[in-house]
Amino acid sequence: MKIQRIVVGYLNTNCYIISKNGKCIIIDPGDEYDKIKNAIGDKKVISIIITHYHFDHIGALKYFDNNVIDYKYKEGKYNIDDFEFNIIHTKGHKEDSITIYFEKEKIMFTGDFIFNNSIGRIDLEGGNIDDMKKSLHIISKYDDDIVIYPGHGEDTLLGIEKQKFNLYL
């Protein structure tokens, strides 16, 4: 599985293209559709997943075929073509926030829930400190060697970020 990070928009949002066997899943097409489309190349888009519905994560969504956009993944396990992943509801930054966890690959796409050296803001519309604390408790049960791909900034390891969770709990 290949992971491409494309930084888009004036808030430098990370859009991810996860590809395997000529197919791909797009996570958070925040802006700059042409840049994303160029990175996709000739791969077939089989799904678009949004980690949460803030404008900087959905700006280019309107340019994609509605047949591949999955607006509301429910918590649980999914198997789409060659991709297996889990959806974990991680409220706090926003009430609709999710984390996409590829268990076999040991990677998580956290949107604006967890960043490298921080957590998501809770002072924006839809933010909630109690939900954030619950979500941090849930995620803290996962393995330290999981790679976190956040909605902004560089990737990190869950174990590194867990060391800072107590600052927020």
Please place each PLM-identified region on the residue numbering:
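Residue-level signal for the nucleotide or nucleotide-sugar donor/cofactor binding architecture
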Residues: 85, 126-127
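Short glycine-enriched, charge-decorated loop/helix-capping segments at active-site entrances
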Residues: 120-126
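Divalent-metal (often Zn2+) His-rich catalytic cores of metallo-beta-lactamase-fold enzymes
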Residues: 107, 131-169
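Active-site metal-binding loops of divalent metal-dependent hydrolases
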Residues: 29-31, 53, 92-94, 106-107, ...
